[in-house]
Amino acid sequence: MFLLETERLTITEFTPDMAQAVHMNSLDEDTRRFVPDEVFETVEDAADTIDFLTSQYGGTEGPLVYPVLTKDGANVGYVQAVPLDEGQWEVGYHIGGAYTKRGYATEAVSAFLPVIMQKLGIDKISGICVSENLASRRVMEKCGFRLEYEGEGEYQGEKRNIARYVKE
């Protein structure tokens, strides 16, 4: 069982009873704008995704996605490691709109990175976002990533202006 605790947060594995919170956290405007493939229009869509994600926990093929909970049990978002090409990985994260601007993403990503990088046996991980997603960029910068590329690139199947960061 994956379990990681910080001062304010717990990062653990998904359970089926989290579907409602995952659904609700995915509906904010920033999710629709920046990560539209992570919007779950129904609780059933969220439950199906949780079912798939929990099937990935035994291995290292990914995606490896873990919910972020506050100490009082509120599901505020997730952190993830997603495989790219040729043994490379990308970190991802999302904090639901009702919980943003509290430093949860930075706290979760800072704690998650060393643990997941060790689990995967990697010494480098990327972070990619739409260039205009300033909040996501700030999280990566606070977590020690350096900007590697900014310009046109593919993002969620579309040509967009992206920022690609790397942490070694």
Regions found by a protein language model. Give the residues of each.
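Acyl-donor (CoA/ACP) binding surface of acyl/acetyltransferases
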Residues: 1-33, 65-168
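A short hydrophobic/aromatic micro-motif that marks alpha-helical segments and, especially, helix-coil
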Residues: 14, 42-44, 57
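Secondary-structure boundary/capping residues
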Residues: 40, 59-62, 125
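Juxtamembrane helix-loop transition sites at the ends of transmembrane segments
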Residues: 45, 51-54, 124, 163-165
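A short helix-loop-beta-strand connector motif used in the catalytic cores of GNAT acetyltransferases and
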Residues: 52-67
